[in-house]
Amino acid sequence: MKFAKTFLLLFVVLLLLSIVMAEPKRGFGKLLRKVFKVGRRVAGSAAEISGSSGGEE
């Protein structure tokens, strides 16, 4: 359970870094909004997954 959360966090950080490197200050606000939207969706699905398999710990 902890490993999954750590992996997800690492993945999000790497994704943000790669996006920031690829888009230097061009449309940054719009980009951030898009990232937050995707991030919320990912977090929601991750919560569902961890919720359904939470009894295994």
Swiss-Prot record:
Which keywords annotate this record?
Answer: Antibiotic, Antimicrobial, Secreted, Signal, Toxin
Query: Which tissues does it occur in?
Result: Expressed by the venom secretory cell of the spine. The spine is a cuticular structure containing a single large nucleated venom-secreting cell at its base. It is an independent unit capable of producing, storing and injecting venom. On the back of D.vulnerans caterpillars, spines are grouped together by 50 to 100 to form scoli, of which there are eight in D.vulnerans.
Record's subcellular location: Secreted
Q: State the source organism's domain of life.
A: Eukaryota
Residues of the signal peptide: 1-24
Q: Name one GO molecular function term.
A: toxin activity
User: Chief subcellular site?
Assistant: secreted
Q: Name one GO cellular component term.
A: extracellular region
**GO biological process terms, semicolon-separated:** defense response to bacterium
Positions in coiled-coil regions = none
Q: What's this chain's function?
A: Peptide that induces pain in mammals and has insecticidal, antibacterial and antiparasitic activities. Induces partially reversible paralysis in D.melanogaster when tested at high doses. Shows a moderate antiparasitic activity against the major pathogenic nematode of ruminants (H.contortus, EC(50)=30.5 uM). Has potent or moderate antibacterial activities against A.baumannii (MIC<0.25 ug/mL) and S.aureus (MIC=16 ug/mL). Has no activity on the other bacteria tested, nor on the fungus C.albicans.
What protein family does this chain belong to?
Belongs to the limacoditoxin-2 (cecropin-like) family.
Name of the protein in its database record:
DELTA-limacoditoxin(2)-Dv11
Q: Which organism is it from?
A: Doratifera vulnerans (Mottled cup moth)
Taxonomic lineage of the native organism = Eukaryota, Metazoa, Ecdysozoa, Arthropoda, Hexapoda
